[in-house]
Amino acid sequence: MSKVIGIDLGTTNSCIAILEGDEPKVIQNPEGARTTPSVVAFKNDETQVGEVAKRQAITNPNTIQSIKRHMGTDYKVDVDGKSYTPQEISAMVLQNLKSTAEDYLGESVDKAVITVPAYFNDSERQATKDAGKIAGLEVERIINEPTAAALAYGLDKTEQDQKVLVFDLGGGTFDVSILELGDGVFEVLSTAGDNKLGGDDFDQVIIDHLVAEFKKENSVDLSKDKMALQRLKDAAEKAKKDLSGVSQTQISLPFISAGENGPLHLELTLTRSKFEELADSLIRRTMEPTRQAMKDAGLSSSDIDEVILVGGSTRIPAVQEAVKKEVGKDPHKGVNPDEVVAMGAAIQGGVITGDVKDVVLLDVTPLSLGIEIMGGRMNTLIERNTTIPTSKSQVYSTAADNQPAVDIHVLQGERPMAADNKTLGRFQLTDIPAAPRGVPQIEVTFDIDKNGIVNVTAKDLGTNKEQNITIQSSSALSDDEIDRMVKDAEENAEADKKRREESDLRNEADSLVFQVEKTITDLGENISEEDKQNAEDKKEALKSALEGEDIDDIKAKKEDLEKVVQDLSTKVYEQAAQAQQQAQGEDANASQDSNVEDADFKEVKDDDNQDNQK
């Protein structure tokens, strides 16, 4: 099988790697650099890509940068009367990388693994695939950047399960992902970030500082001069990189401008501490998504086993220190953060060609899956974005006494009410032995295989009888449908909350009616006729209210019945106490040997009994 190249198609820089033997190797571009700027420029009917395009970004209006931000949208770029889609611009970057790989390998390259941020939706991923196709590449797999980074660090080779935090501060975007690794399986637990924060912002604070200092000294505003701004940008980027290794750097830009008395030069010493002061607000902005990602994954910093840094801006010592302080662990520094994602993509290429074994590539469920339960609610078993294959079981029971069958209504969607979600299928589990409500144990299992085929099984744990349904292509929804359903869930959150509260109220009221009926039966002759009639009246009033739509009436009748239940419980308690005291008076020894928990009624010195009271 021909080579499958790994491509990190970044917002500001891209990188390409290939698997040589067992090791990924980054391929240098013709200029000798290991990364290529994701910049395209049009000049004199010529298309330029990479460093040459970046160098004239400010002075040439036909220069396109950060096109990745627009992938999956209908955004267009107009250049000299011609429109280009984000896919076409990205394809030009990919063609450049493809050409670099072909020059290195000495053969044509037509297969690639391309990485995308973990938060990319289906349309953004599809747009990335389309860009590869335009560039003449068959995109074998689109994989998540944090997964690729974890692969490059060899974390799939560890024996025990691990939770990994991937801190990715690129040129134009920032995101944090939490991954769980085990048995070669990579699962993205959560992702958070800021797509308007990156290395460019760190350059900008230096540029702003240089402009302010120069203006203070010379009364000249360099931000109004395009040529000067291009030189400032290059100098700021270099200074930022220098300060990752040294405590201060000299910025020297002769003939940057001209004043009344001749040429003006910019000479300034920038210390690391001053840079950290300028960038402090940016560094603090990275911490909130870091905390959010851990919160969404249900983890604290102590649960994180490894921290991986991705992106050139993570070389900034203050960034590394902030991550260490927040997570409480030293980040991994074994792999170049600019190259780690491309190297992981190359390893995935090796998985596809069969050169790399024991790594499982996973897809995810685009929407939550569950069943309808009492009150017309959807009870979710498998959450949206769960990696597949997966399996989940939950035990349910009957809603009525002597219920002979249960209907299993399989649903897909994000809304709390069953009627608002998509029906995938229905089936029935029959011949349930007669029993009071709540007694039968019905286990419902959702099983999704690697192809996304859902198998739902309902099993009566008492008789071991089971019934199932197989649903082909559970994710056969258009992107528009998925987007609409998620959007509906957001827009209707308040209305859904009210309906959910109503459903909860009705379920609680229904349970209360059942509880009162059972209590009256259990008490038998121990309840007075007056109390019994009062309870029956209040119970019937609540049942009648449940048949209507007046929520306030249901609430009021439920509270009335709850008070009756409380009064009954108090009387039962008092009767039990009196009976207990009589029994103690008649036979103290029998009382001590009794299994009745009487700790509430007399002082007990024994330590174990004291524990039982707590």
Curated annotation (Swiss-Prot):
The modification Phosphothreonine is found at T173. Gene3D superfamilies: 1.20.1270.10, 3.30.420.40, Actin, Chain A, domain 4, Substrate Binding Domain Of DNAk, Chain A, domain 1. The keyword Chaperone applies. Induction: By stress conditions e.g. heat shock. InterPro entries: ATPase_NBD, Chaperone_DnaK, Heat_shock_70_CS, HSP70_C_sf, HSP70_peptide-bd_sf, Hsp_70_fam. The gene is dnaK. The keyword Chaperone applies. It comes from the Bacteria. GO terms for molecular function: ATP binding; ATP-dependent protein folding chaperone; unfolded protein binding. Belongs to the heat shock protein 70 family. It comes from Staphylococcus saprophyticus subsp. saprophyticus (strain ATCC 15305 / DSM 20229 / NCIMB 8711 / NCTC 7292 / S-41). Acts as a chaperone. Residues 490-510, 524-555, 575-614 are annotated as: Disordered. Keywords: ATP-binding, Chaperone, Nucleotide-binding, Phosphoprotein, Stress response. This is Chaperone protein DnaK. Residues 575-584 have a biased composition (Low complexity). Residues 490-509, 529-542, 599-614 have a biased composition (Basic and acidic residues).
